[in-house]
Amino acid sequence: MSPNNQNEYEIIDALSPTSVSDNSIRYPLANDQTNTLQNMNYKDYLKMTESTNAELSRNPGTFISAQDAVGTGIDIVSTIISGLGIPVLGEVFSILGSLIGLLWPSNNENVWQIFMNRVEELIDQKILDSVRSRAIADLANSRIAVEYYQNALEDWRKNPHSTRSAALVKERFGNAEAILRTNMGSFSQTNYETPLLPTYAQAASLHLLVMRDVQIYGKEWGYPQNDIDLFYKEQVSYTARYSDHCVQWYNAGLNKLRGTGAKQWVDYNRFRREMNVMVLDLVALFPNYDARIYPLETNAELTREIFTDPVGSYVTGQSSTLISWYDMIPAALPSFSTLENLLRKPDFFTLLQEIRMYTSFRQNGTIEYYNYWGGQRLTLSYIYGSSFNKYSGVLAGAEDIIPVGQNDIYRVVWTYIGRYTNSLLGVNPVTFYFSNNTQKTYSKPKQFAGGIKTIDSGEELTYENYQSYSHRVSYITSFEIKSTGGTVLGVVPIFGWTHSSASRNNFIYATKISQIPINKASRTSGGAVWNFQEGLYNGGPVMKLSGSGSQVINLRVATDAKGASQRYRIRIRYASDRAGKFTISSRSPENPATYSASIAYTNTMSTNASLTYSTFAYAESGPINLGISGSSRTFDISITKEAGAANLYIDRIEFIPVNTLFEAEEDLDVAKKAVNGLFTNEKDALQTSVTDYQVNQAANLIECLSDELYPNEKRMLWDAVKEAKRLVQARNLLQDTGFNRINGENGWTGSTGIEVVEGDVLFKDRSLRLTSAREIDTETYPTYLYQQIDESLLKPYTRYKLKGFIGSSQDLEIKLIRHRANQIVKNVPDNLLPDVRPVNSCGGVDRCSEQQYVDANLALENNGENGNMSSDSHAFSFHIDTGEIDLNENTGIWIVFKIPTTNGNATLGNLEFVEEGPLSGETLEWAQQQEQQWQDKMARKRAASEKTYYAAKQAIDRLFADYQDQKLNSGVEMSDLLAAQNLVQSIPYVYNDALPEIPGMNYTSFTELTNRLQQAWNLYDLQNAIPNGDFRNGLSNWNATSDVNVQQLSDTSVLVIPNWNSQVSQQFTVQPNYRYVLRVTARKEGVGDGYVIIRDGANQTETLTFNICDDDTGVLSTDQTSYITKTVEFTPSTEQVWIDMSETEGVFNIESVELVLEEE
């Protein structure tokens, strides 16, 4: 036979009796099983999962006798996947019953010994006899306890109303749980943690599954809710403990096998593969045992990729001619790291579409030759995504195509060529077994004797048949083996496999929780740094996002007609060292409208910490409509991680169908918890931490309850929340909390720019909107609102707290003022609701939908380190402490809200000022010290205040001729009024330092004297015949050239005549033939004279002249005391009189011009 005549040796298809692909039938219940299970009743279902149906599941007894520990591990994982969650209809599948049959089969095969023996071989470490004996003995006890419990559970299921059956199953549950928990120490004995690891993982699984049952049946067995809650808390704790133990000792065993040579890598990879199957796959399913998080039937998928041995491993020694590839001599073998780098790193999940195989040829002497598989080009595709090629090996020679398409390769049989003599090496032929019951064989000519072995992939990853298998081929890589002289001896392929539970599509079920691992997304884009990392806790890779940029992850999913009309909650399992928010959006090809929801997530770990079980948490949306319409059943989901520096790990996305009745029950439970959380245990008082906003939110929850399903519960909850509202209002020391009247007699005082809002989407009660500060000319006038808590309402040495809620704000200052000011500044984003606000059918506020968004975002906020003291938190509360109470002083506490900037604003409501409690300990001592310091300071303030007050009062008293302040004393001049005014203005502490709009301690005294001074000014203006003679109204009433102006010097208005050609005049009316006194206070600066001339209609004239000689020093002075007052008598003959003022050179400053009628 010629080696070049290969036409007759093309790929041979071995067709099955039927070539129809049935992708819905897979390894036991590791897929959707749509066709198989759709019409199955629960009895058939239980029979199938308990292995009575040979078509769908193996018989545990026959399996154990034929296969090894890996096969048992595969069957156990598949059995668990089949029974996750709680079906909507029918009984809960007893995973426990099936596992008992697998772990303690009827043929008495000791599976636990097989587990231990296998790990001994993998890591070359024997388990001490005493350690093994203790473990086996405790396993026997565990078996008895679990079987007895399972028997009682089945009896109770048949007689659910029997108190005897309930009592028995309750007793046996407690016994089984205790024994399983106690025995776990036997499977983690010191120095044998890794050899016992599969035993530990299986025992842990049994314990957690037993604990799961009390969450499902506990109430029916008679457990009080407190006990059920305690069991749940313990289950969560043990799940974390068991998971961390498994990962820790898996890593320890793997690292122990790390080496440098090719054979060491084979051992390393074999341990990794088999421990994934026996341990880590199980750990990945532990979270699904949580019946509270997974209360529905659940579809789980494992997307990790494992690799079988390089073809031709572990064959040396079976015959004198057969040799493993790594024992070839002389050969330049690949290193440990070279082989490790051949494997595909964690990445997006792909499906194998096609294999193009290339053939190499080797001649050995003149007679022997053979063709062998030299390399391959794989065509891979993402889920609903694009295809791409991967190459490996020698890409030369004849090309053969193995189409895969929508089928799976579940089994491969290789013929390995590994002859010691002449170091012959290769693979030929190879048979691929497909899930449509066909086989395709690659076979090429060869002619030589000896050194051949047939290797079946089923020896490493077991299968039942084309309908029932655990893994599919996902990847192939290969490497050359050369002699030390460089001659190619052959090529060795390595096969990658994924679990068959990972479906070819991302299907969302209408009645099951659908888990879609994150690496089944199709692409990602954005500014964050991202990569996939091995997820030892997760059954597949996790996506790590880091850096400050945002990132969009695109996921295409599919559903059926029933699923298209279903609403879902979307839940993301993640870990993060910083809180943040996901935005979920969906759209289908036939419905371009985008449906979106926000999901807040909290930080679950410290910065750059390693992943553990407990670092993973769930972030969940409210019910949303995915917007699926038309005939299309595929649509796109986008998950956007907001910008912000963080290390975020995403495990999977879950779609939880919303069942109307279930959702109503859940809503009732949430409302009950919210209302109960408002009260103390006695239900007669509020929790001190409860806020008015929380009471309103609880009312919203009650409002959304179904009237048809829960009329009585809703009525009772309404009564409770109304009582809570009454108690909130009773403890609130603020007046007018409904903002009925701003600037009324009692309550709030405010500036312009305050709007009272009713029906705001965030506030059930009335709320306030504060606009930005106003800017007029160069002055900025803040928007403010304040209220004083009267001293009589306060208690000594007590802490009071201000609480409230902010919809959004910018530069909002909130102050509490007593002896000192406490202040916070709030810059709160408007981020609680989506851009399109929820409305009801009438176009009004949809409180039910609004609640979901608000709760999700507040959950994120409440996880912050600073709580509601953070500047961007929506809720706020901060305190102030009192010292001694002084009713005479009536300092009280001032509550202030202020917008000081022109771009500031705020919306706020639910304001409360409440007593928190008396001070004690160090806080009390500190307050007493502060009080003493304050009293000392007040004594000094009072002394200074009294001195300035009495000086000002005496100055004002001297202005008046009577006690009724109706007449000025004769001879009172403007300078007297200005002097008195200066004294009044010198009174300190008139306004509050923190907010000038708030009266200070001397405000009343200051106001009294200011009013009297104003009366003096009014009387003075009446006696001065010249209007605006003091220029307090600028140039009003005066005629002046454009260069003349009035300047404000201290509290005095001064007319400034700057030039010799400047002119100021006024015409006014007097009583003719009466004697007046013209009095002018002025000052001349520089050379020249200043003139004030008065004349009447008869040309009668008097002149007052000012120059620098009027000052005794003769030196130019800017001091106000240098102003000179001059007078002259004037008796006008006419009613009309004129005043003219000018100067010859320099500057002429005039403070006042008076024409006063002399008394007789």
From Swiss-Prot:
<dbReference type="InterPro" id="IPR048645">
    <property type="entry name" value="Cry1Ac-like_dom-VII"/>
</dbReference>
<dbReference type="InterPro" id="IPR005639">
    <property type="entry name" value="Pest_crys_dom_I"/>
</dbReference>
<protein>
    <recommendedName>
        <fullName>Pesticidal crystal protein Cry8Ca</fullName>
    </recommendedName>
</protein>
<keyword id="KW-0800">Toxin</keyword>
<dbReference type="InterPro" id="IPR038979">
    <property type="entry name" value="Pest_crys"/>
</dbReference>
<dbReference type="Pfam" id="PF03944">
    <property type="entry name" value="Endotoxin_C"/>
</dbReference>
<dbReference type="GO" id="GO:0005102">
    <property type="term" value="F:signaling receptor binding"/>
</dbReference>
<dbReference type="InterPro" id="IPR008979">
    <property type="entry name" value="Galactose-bd-like_sf"/>
</dbReference>
<dbReference type="InterPro" id="IPR041587">
    <property type="entry name" value="Cry_V"/>
</dbReference>
<dbReference type="GO" id="GO:0030435">
    <property type="term" value="P:sporulation resulting in formation of a cellular spore"/>
</dbReference>
<dbReference type="Pfam" id="PF00555">
    <property type="entry name" value="Endotoxin_M"/>
</dbReference>
<dbReference type="Pfam" id="PF03945">
    <property type="entry name" value="Endotoxin_N"/>
</dbReference>
<dbReference type="GO" id="GO:0090729">
    <property type="term" value="F:toxin activity"/>
</dbReference>
<dbReference type="InterPro" id="IPR005638">
    <property type="entry name" value="Pest_crys_dom-III"/>
</dbReference>
<dbReference type="Pfam" id="PF21463">
    <property type="entry name" value="Cry1Ac_dom-VII"/>
</dbReference>
<dbReference type="InterPro" id="IPR001178">
    <property type="entry name" value="Pest_cryst_dom_II"/>
</dbReference>
<comment type="function">
    <text>Promotes colloidosmotic lysis by binding to the midgut epithelial cells of insects. Active on various scarabaeid beetles such as Anomala cuprea, A.rufocuprea and Popillia japonica.</text>
</comment>
<dbReference type="GO" id="GO:0001907">
    <property type="term" value="P:symbiont-mediated killing of host cell"/>
</dbReference>
<dbReference type="InterPro" id="IPR036399">
    <property type="entry name" value="Pest_cryst_cen_dom_sf"/>
</dbReference>
<keyword id="KW-0843">Virulence</keyword>
<dbReference type="Pfam" id="PF17997">
    <property type="entry name" value="Cry1Ac_D5"/>
</dbReference>
<dbReference type="InterPro" id="IPR036716">
    <property type="entry name" value="Pest_crys_N_sf"/>
</dbReference>
<keyword id="KW-0749">Sporulation</keyword>
<comment type="similarity">
    <text>Belongs to the delta endotoxin family.</text>
</comment>
